Regions:
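FIC/Doc superfamily catalytic core
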Residues: 1-142
Length: 142
């Protein structure tokens, strides 16, 4: 297995993903100021994919990590608005940092993000599994 997987920092979300979402995905609603985000929610979203328990990684491989990252960015609402859009750009950024990309239409990905957002939290594992399958369909090497 490839050992050099790169995580994302809060600063990268602020300066890359958040800014890109704000510039290119305003659509109907504005995205509020980065400083208005909820304390610790974003930190948790970014840390969870890399957590271990009893010496074992909870999420193995890039697809699993990307899937839980996207799920948490959408479902945990780290921002007051724009969570789905910021989640999309964060996903692209995480993949590109790890030499991957998704060849998917923005609207299709946004529709999928809306589906994830409306999913039943009790079905978290099934939803994350669906995200993994979605990623497998569209992921490409950079």
């Amino acid at each position: 297995a490839w050992k050099g997987m790169k995580s994302i920092t809060i600063t990268e979300v602020e300066y890359v993903a958040y800014r890109l979402a704000k510039e290119h995905m305003l659509w109907d609603e504005p995205i509020p100021d980065f400083s208005s985000r909820f304390p610790n929610a974003l930190e948790s979203c970014l840390a969870t994919p890399f957590q271990a328990f009893g010496g074992k990684k909870l999420y193995k491989g890039l697809i699993e990590k990307a899937a839980i990252l996207f799920y948490l960015m959408v479902k945990n609402h780290p921002f007051k608005n724009g969570n789905k859009r910021i989640a999309m750009v964060t996903l692209f950024y995480f993949l590109s940092k790890n030499k991957k990309w998704m060849e998917v239409d923005n609207q299709e990905l946004y529709n999928f993000a809306k589906w994830v957002a409306s999913s039943n939290p009790k079905l978290r594992e099934d939803t994350v599994s669906a995200i993994k399958n979605f990623l497998k369909v569209y992921i490409k090497d950079l």
